[in-house]
Amino acid sequence: MKNQKLAQALIAAAFALAAAPLAIAQTQGVSKTEIVIGTEQDLSGPIVAFSKQLKNGMEMRVEEINAAGGIHGRKLKLIIEDHGYDPKKAVLATQKLVQKDKIFAMVGLIGTPTAMAAMPILFAKNIPNLFPITAAREMYEPLHRLKYSVTATYYEQVRASVKHMVRLKGFKKVCTLYQDDDFGLEVMRGAEAGLKEINMALAEKTTYKRGATDFSSQVAKMKDTGCDLVVLGTIIRETIGTIGTARKLGWNVEFMGTSASYTDLIHKLGGPAMNGFYSTNTVNNPYMDDASKNVREWALKYKDKYKEDPAVFSVYGYQVIDLFIRIADKAGPNLTTDTFINAIEKFSMPRDMFGGDELSFSKTKHLGSNRARLSQIVNGKWTPVTDYITE
């Protein structure tokens, strides 16, 4: 009987030992020597300039961690696919990354419609969608164990900042010009909500179709209304076009945008007319002469590598990979989707050297931070004018 029990115990132990490496092998994208992650960028479409910077920042951080020995001895491999900012292409790119490349996680995918197209494919294979480059609420709502975001929503950026601007400068008539799509509606609704909290309402609402280049009628309408602050739901070309049109008409109204228009391209392409423009932002643009020594050194390293100055999207790319590295490290040497999720739901970190806000996640909080700050273009450079706005 004793021999029989001993035999059974030995068999059970053998199965347990055999199952341990099997559990690791069954975690897609994780081997003894490597962690494979994927991203999808627009390398051939309308926001290729942003994605080029993102790609550079991501690859820079990957090279750094690999040179330092990796994560618990595993090198990090980043596979980049081009979706051209097209949801149909995003579906194909996601299928390749999941089925052929066997990624462990999707990190830093750019675009709301493309992320929405990718998530069902990822989630069906138990693959997380981490830190997409979009401020849409759908990136963390409704709550799902496999989706996590870090970017303050357009709605919340505008809700808080429009109240702050009114209180700071005493504006009496707030108007808005926004893109006629989901992005623009989020901006408009945020402005409405913020003004309602201080017993105000939008004095004028104007829209434009995506791809528009003439904003003269919208600007004239808002000027006739007597607006003294215009909230812009615009990106690059539309921001420059609207402000430029207003200045040509001799209308020196104040303009405020969102993180979608917080880019060095505004002042580089728009010139002196862009001075005075306000925008919300969640991280500071890294100028080569930044006040921070750490940022200056980072920017110099970036420029040496890529032969161009870094920009805010370079920082976004660097940050999302850095965040993945930190959480994967906390997950420990036995990296699985479950251990990663357990680590992220207990994760928090202070502000980083780029001015990014404190981040924290939990089982019920899958957005790292929902705060933004205001910056203004002064003498051709973005300059912070507030800390992170809480109300």
What are these regions (language model features)?
Residues 34-36, 49-56, 64, 68-140, ...:
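Beta-alpha junction/loop-to-helix N-cap segments that form part of ligand/metal-binding clefts
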Residues 243-317, 384, 388-390:
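Extracellular/periplasmic periplasmic-binding protein-like sensory domains
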Residues 304-314, 325-382:
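Segments of small-molecule ligand-sensing domains
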Residues 42, 63, 322-330:
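Short glycine/serine- and small hydrophobic-enriched flexible loop segments
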Residues 25-39, 67-76, 166-172:
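Immediate post-signal peptide segment of exported/extracytoplasmic ligand-binding proteins
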Residues 29-59, 81-88, 110-113, 177-186, ...:
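Extracytoplasmic "Venus flytrap"
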Residues 1-36, 389-391:
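Short, low-complexity disordered leader/linker segments with a strong preference
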Residues 88, 102-205, 254-279:
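Extracytoplasmic ligand/sensor domains, especially the bilobed periplasmic-binding protein
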